[in-house]
C-alpha cells in the first residue's frame, strides 16, 4: 500500500521533488487492513511531507471521496506542508463536470496542491 511505500522510502533516505497522488476512498490490504480516506489521509500526507526534498516543486492530491470537504483538505495541507515548506502556496478546490444543456455543475471531488513560489 502507498503508506507503507512512503514509510519505506523515508527509511531509505529517499526524497522527492514532487508528489502527485490520487488515494482511494476505500480499500483493503492483503492482510485485511482497511483504508478509509477520511481516517487515513492525514497520515499519508504527513508521511509524504517527510519525503519532500527541501527543493521540492509541488505536491498534488485529489479525491473523489464524498463528505470530505476542500476546506478540510486546505487546513490539512496548510498545517502539514507550510511549516516545512513556507516558500510555497496552497490551493484547494472542487472538481466538477458541467451538466449538458444546463448552467449547472455536477460535483465530483476535491483537489489540493502546494507549489513552490
Predicted regions mapped to residue ranges:
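S-adenosyl-L-methionine
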Residues: 1-20
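A short glycine-rich, Lys/Arg-flanked "PGG" loop and its adjoining helix->strand segment in the class I
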Residues: 38-54
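C-terminal catalytic and target-recognition region of SAM-dependent MTase-like enzymes
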Residues: 56-117
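Conserved protein kinase catalytic core
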Residues: 7, 28, 68
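Conserved proline-anchored active-site loop of SAM-dependent methyltransferases
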Residues: 16-30
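Short basic/hydrophobic patches in alpha-helices and adjacent helix-turn junctions
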Residues: 8-11, 47-51, 58, 79
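Glycine/threonine-rich flexible loop motifs
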Residues: 29-37
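Glycine-rich, phosphate-binding/catalytic loops in enzymes
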Residues: 36-39, 77-78
Amino acid at each position: 500500500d502507498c503508506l507503507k511505500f512512503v514509510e519505506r522510502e523515508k527509511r531509505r533516505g529517499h526524497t522527492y521533488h514532487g508528489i502527485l497522488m490520487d488515494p482511494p476512498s476505500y480499500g483493503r490490504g492483503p492482510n485485511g487492513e482497511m483504508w478509509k480516506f477520511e481516517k487515513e489521509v492525514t497520515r499519508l500526507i504527513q508521511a509524504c511531507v517527510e519525503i519532500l526534498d527541501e527543493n521540492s516543486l509541488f505536491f498534488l492530491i485529489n479525491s473523489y471521496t464524498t463528505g470530505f470537504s476542500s476546506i478540510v483538505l486546505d487546513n490539512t495541507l496548510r498545517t502539514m506542508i507550510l511549516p516545512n515548506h513556507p516558500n510555497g502556496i496552497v490551493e484547494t478546490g472542487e472538481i466538477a463536470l458541467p451538466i449538458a444543456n444546463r448552467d449547472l455543475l455536477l460535483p465530483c471531488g476535491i483537489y489540493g496542491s502546494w507549489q513552490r513560489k
